[in-house]
Amino acid sequence: MSFTTTVKEELIHLSASDQTELSAIIKLAGSLGLANQSLNLSITTENAKIARYIYALIEDTYHIIPEIKYHQKTNLKKNRVYTVYLDKQVDKLLADLKLADSFFGIETGIEQQVMSDDDAGRAYLKGAFLAAGTVRDPESGKYQLEIYSVYLDHAQDLAQLMHKFMLDAKVIERKNGAVTYLQKAEDIMDFLIIIGAMSCKEEFEAVKLLREARNDINRANNAETANIAKTITASMRTINNIIKIMDTIGLDSLPVELQQIAQMRVANPDYSLQQIADSLDFAITKSGVNHRLRKINKLAEDL
């Protein structure tokens, strides 16, 4: 099951909001038809549970019994498209939800009452996501939540509504409409809270934190590997210089304090400067070891 489906199935198990939610669903997933000189309304979805939810929402709100139809896009079961079909009292429903102008392209944005009321705004966002929303699985590490609108005006109003809830929503035009989207993980989690998908918000956050922890561990491991490689490279340079001294003037020609450092370095090529300092039988700091190794390198280079 996709994360989008998980979110939507959590939403339909919440108590239905109100007519505002139904209004958003119909506006984004509905289409009008004409048969026998009367209007009919079709609301489409690819999820049978959402179709039943819309059916119940219409029945409970308006005491009208719709039909649920379905057809196959292909031979695969998952490509079924479900339609909640209504051919009675469509005019009344559209008028009550103030949707008539929307379907005839006269008023394609979001009603001002929804834009100005927080509860109505939450209900509208819930309905909009149920009808036309998608969200990437947080496991992908590429965070994106989108709601598709047929009209650019509606997509822009949707972004403005999200801005009211302090979400950094943006709009992009597509070939057959426009998309309102969020790309920040924190915004997506806040959106899930706003529409009531608390369990999915917790799941999203847990996956995000786990990914970040894994990335931190990988970065630390990479840094440690790089430091080890750097230590060994520097160590081999010094060891080659010590061998050069041994072959030319002999190690005994060096001061005692340099001889001890040289012997420790040759015996332990993978030791860090601190490990060399800790292994000597006299007190010396990490910088002291580094200073003496630089002296050895300089002596070898001058030979």
Curated annotation (Swiss-Prot):
Identify the Gene3D superfamilies for this entry: Homing endonucleases
Residues annotated as DNA-binding are: 272-303
- Tell me where on the tree of life, at the top rank, the source sits: Bacteria
What keywords appear on the UniProt entry?
Cell cycle, Cell division, DNA-binding
Q: Which GO terms describe its molecular function?
A: DNA binding
One Pfam entry name: LAGLIDADG_WhiA
Task: Tell me the Gene Ontology biological-process terms attached to this UniProt entry.
Answer: cell division; regulation of sporulation
Protein family (similarity comment): Belongs to the WhiA family.
Q: What does this protein do?
A: Involved in cell division and chromosome segregation.
What PANTHER family does the database record attribute to this sequence? CELL DIVISION PROTEIN WHIA-RELATED (PTHR37307:SF1)
Record protein name field: Probable cell division protein WhiA
Record lineage? Bacteria, Bacillati, Bacillota, Bacilli, Lactobacillales
